[in-house]
A protein has these predicted regions:
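A metal-dependent hydrolase metal-coordination microenvironment
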Residues: 2-125
């Protein structure tokens, strides 16, 4: 019964996309490199992922400027995107933002410019 339902849903929905995943070193909780995240996702039948690493001030290393942090953050995405292009898996940039106003995490999907990211880190917790 369950396997029939899974098969039916798989036929109806052409896309299987992971909407929230982390990689290392951009996210401290990430267990895999960007390339490993992409390859593992493809091996499990995903057609795409949204790389939503943690985007918060506490991730900034001592002495690192906001711009340097953003560049380091984006590096994981660029690495994942290159691997995705190589093996045919769509990689979308996202982020998991925690703002100062509360301790909620917000998932943001889609592209963001480097300049916007630098401005956003100022609002991050």
């Amino acid at each position: 019964m369950i396997s029939e339902l899974v098969r039916s849903l798989s036929e109806q929905y052409k896309y299987k996309i992971e909407m929230h995943c982390h990689s290392m070193p951009a996210s401290a909780c990430g267990e895999f490199t960007p390339e490993e995240v992409v390859r593992t996702s493809a091996e499990h039948g995903y057609s795409g992922i949204v790389l939503t690493n943690h985007f918060m001030r506490k991730c900034i290393c001592d002495g690192e400027s906001d711009a340097e942090y953003v560049d380091r953050y984006l590096e994981d995405y660029y690495r994942a995107r290159l691997e995705g292009e190589r093996i045919g898996l769509e990689v979308i940039l996202g982020l998991e933002l925690r703002v100062r106003a509360n301790s909620n995490d917000y998932l943001i999907y889609g592209t963001i410019s480097r300049e916007d990211a630098i401005r956003m880190i100022g609002a991050a917790n």
